[in-house]
């Protein structure tokens, strides 16, 4: 059996998958925030419960936000303070007496989608998350591409390209990002960025779901906003595609539930690509909340 953990700032979610990659059982517990020992205990107790339930010693994979393993073997995960700065993989491997695999949660999302039966035909799969932030991962022949610093796929921290500023207006504000830089595309293309753009142009503070509801009702202002957002997304994604040239782009995160993102994006891309470039297939993520657990479990299938 394959155990996949999706660990975030508020919850530890475990999914158990069989050899056919089907989910057999899942459980969630709160993430301990202050004690590393309590954090390790929470993970180990879930593993012990799964071992007992299925009568086996399952493999363990973990997806977690941040850099899963720095050069000295420690984890950097600001959203999981109890474990950040600790040798998490080594400690869990020792306590569980088995090989523990660890990767960035966005890579696990992308891996989950790349291993979907419909998508395994594509050699290079790009996962793009449009949620609280903007991120993603790259999967080549079923394996994550991590890079030297584990930052492959940090698309949200690319800066707005010149074409975007020309389109939006040269007086368009370059917002300061949590990373310390200005103009990162995450501040405009995330769910929060989607709402910020609406407020910037129409001086009305509305959350993304309400804007989308207005769009569905035919509201002209909301429709103009969505057109502008999609144009901005196409400019930024065009830069990424020129570098990566994937066969498939799978979009996840809260904004992926908005059909216009996947149905109207492809037609906007060609003018932002080289003439010889082919627009990749663009699809909405298939596995929803289970994607992180699923991808983490499949880390043991990438050998």
UniProtKB/Swiss-Prot annotation:
GO terms for molecular function: ATP binding; N-acetylglucosamine kinase activity; zinc ion binding. It is an enzyme of class 2 (transferase). ATP binds at residues 4-11, 133-140. Zn(2+) binds at residues 157, 177, 179, 184. It catalyses: N-acetyl-D-glucosamine + ATP = N-acetyl-D-glucosamine 6-phosphate + ADP + H(+). Its EC number is 2.7.1.59. Pathway: Cell wall biogenesis; peptidoglycan recycling. Keywords: ATP-binding, Carbohydrate metabolism, Kinase, Metal-binding, Nucleotide-binding, Transferase, Zinc. GO terms for biological process: N-acetylglucosamine metabolic process; peptidoglycan turnover. Belongs to the ROK (NagC/XylR) family. NagK subfamily. Catalyzes the phosphorylation of N-acetyl-D-glucosamine (GlcNAc) derived from cell-wall degradation, yielding GlcNAc-6-P. PANTHER family: N-ACETYL-D-GLUCOSAMINE KINASE, ROK (REPRESSOR, ORF, KINASE) FAMILY. This is N-acetyl-D-glucosamine kinase. It comes from Escherichia coli O157:H7. The gene is nagK.
């Amino acid at each position: 059996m394959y155990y996949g953990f999706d660990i975030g700032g508020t919850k530890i979610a475990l999914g158990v998958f069989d050899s056919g990659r089907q989910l057999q059982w899942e459980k969630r517990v709160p993430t301990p925030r202050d004690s590393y020992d309590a954090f390790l205990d929470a993970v180990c107790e879930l593993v012990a419960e799964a071992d007992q339930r299925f009568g086996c010693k399952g493999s363990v994979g973990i997806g977690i936000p941040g850099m899963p393993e720095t050069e000295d073997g420690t984890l950097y995960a600001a959203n999981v303070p109890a474990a950040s700065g600790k040798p998490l993989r080594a400690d869990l491997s020792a306590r569980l007496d088995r090989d523990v695999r660890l990767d960035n949660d966005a890579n696990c999302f992308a891996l989950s989608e790349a291993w979907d039966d419909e998508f395994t035909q594509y050699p290079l799969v790009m996962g793009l998350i449009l949620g609280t932030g903007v991120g993603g991962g790259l999967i080549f022949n079923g394996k994550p591409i991590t890079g030297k610093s584990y930052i492959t796929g940090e698309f949200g921290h690319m800066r707005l390209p010149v074409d975007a500023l020309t389109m939006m207006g040269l007086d368009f504000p370059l917002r300061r990002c949590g990373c310390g830089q200005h103009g990162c595309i995450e501040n405009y293309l995330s769910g929060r960025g989607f709402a910020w753009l609406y407020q910037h142009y129409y001086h009305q503070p509305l959350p993304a779901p309400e804007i989308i509801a207005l769009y569905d009702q035919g509201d002209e202002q909301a429709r103009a906003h969505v057109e502008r957002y999609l144009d901005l997304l196409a400019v930024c994604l065009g830069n990424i595609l020129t570098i990566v040239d994937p066969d498939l782009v799978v979009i996840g995160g809260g904004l992926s539930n908005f059909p216009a993102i996947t149905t109207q994006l492809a037609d906007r891309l060609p003018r932002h690509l080289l003439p010889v470039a082919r627009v990749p297939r663009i699809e909405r993520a298939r596995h929803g909340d289970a994607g992180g657990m699923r991808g983490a479990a499949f880390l043991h299938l990438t050998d």
